[in-house]
Amino acid sequence: MFEATTILGYRGEFNNKKFALIGGDGQVTLGNCVVKANATKIRSLYHNQVLSGFAGSTADAFSLFDMFERILESKKGDLFKSVVDFSKEWRKDKYLRRLEAMMIVLNLDHIFILSGTGDVLEAEDNKIAAIGSGGNYALSAARALDCFAHLEPKKLVEESLKIAGDLCIYTNTNIKILEL
């Protein structure tokens, strides 16, 4: 279902300054064929205060982006309240419950995974989250690099996604990164 991408979100503090980044690869896969190598699956929302990225069906993801952005606007950028209301609305709608997409949303203070069933999952460490077919590779690499490498945040995201791209056939190394 989500065999098409890798998205990695990373937030925290580096050199006494808060940061939030999201990165994703550019590969779009249809069955066993690569149909696009430079797609953009990450976005900045609410006056560049929230970052998001998706894995799964593109049409479904854009529906979710639009819905989430509307709720985020109504909550004046409050990410926590937005994900809670988003989940409530998602679970009420029979059409939305069948969407085949996942999202990561984050700001300087929080990072969440929004699942295809309407669940909201806060990253275990409130620091690193990954989705998509290469998500576990990127998550493992990011956790190891975060603990031991002391890289700048953007470099950590880039290197973690490169590792995922080397291991996952549905992920490439055409990486795009957004940061707050």
UniProtKB/Swiss-Prot annotation:
The main location is cytoplasm
Role played: Protease subunit of a proteasome-like degradation complex believed to be a general protein degrading machinery.
**Keyword presence, Metal-binding:** yes
Taxonomic lineage of the native organism: Bacteria, Pseudomonadati, Campylobacterota, Epsilonproteobacteria, Campylobacterales
What subcellular locations does the record give? Cytoplasm
Q: Cross-referenced Gene3D superfamilies, in alphabetical order?
A: Glutamine Phosphoribosylpyrophosphate, subunit 1, domain 1
SUBUNIT field: A double ring-shaped homohexamer of HslV is capped on each side by a ring-shaped HslU homohexamer. The assembly of the HslU/HslV complex is dependent on binding of ATP.
For this chain, the family text in UniProt reads: Belongs to the peptidase T1B family. HslV subfamily.
Q: Where is the active site?
A: 5
Q: Reaction catalysed?
A: ATP-dependent cleavage of peptide bonds with broad specificity
Source organism per entry reads Helicobacter acinonychis (strain Sheeba)
GO molecular-function annotation terms?
metal ion binding; threonine-type endopeptidase activity
- What is the name listed in the Swiss-Prot or TrEMBL entry for this protein? ATP-dependent protease subunit HslV
Which UniProt keywords are present, listed alphabetically?
Allosteric enzyme, Cytoplasm, Hydrolase, Metal-binding, Protease, Sodium, Stress response, Threonine protease
Q: Which GO terms describe its biological process?
A: proteolysis involved in protein catabolic process
Characterize the regulation of its activity.
Allosterically activated by HslU binding.
Q: Which residues bind Na(+)?
A: 165, 168, 171
Q: Which GO terms describe its cellular component?
A: HslUV protease complex; proteasome core complex
Q: Which HAMAP family match?
A: HslV
Q: Which PROSITE patterns match?
A: PROTEASOME_BETA_2
Q: Name one Pfam family in it.
A: Proteasome
EC number(s) recorded for this UniProt protein? 3.4.25.2
TM regions (residue ranges):
none
The kind of enzyme this is, by top-level EC class, is hydrolase
Q: Per its UniProt record, what SUPFAM superfamilies does this chain match? A: N-terminal nucleophile aminohydrolases (Ntn hydrolases) (SSF56235)
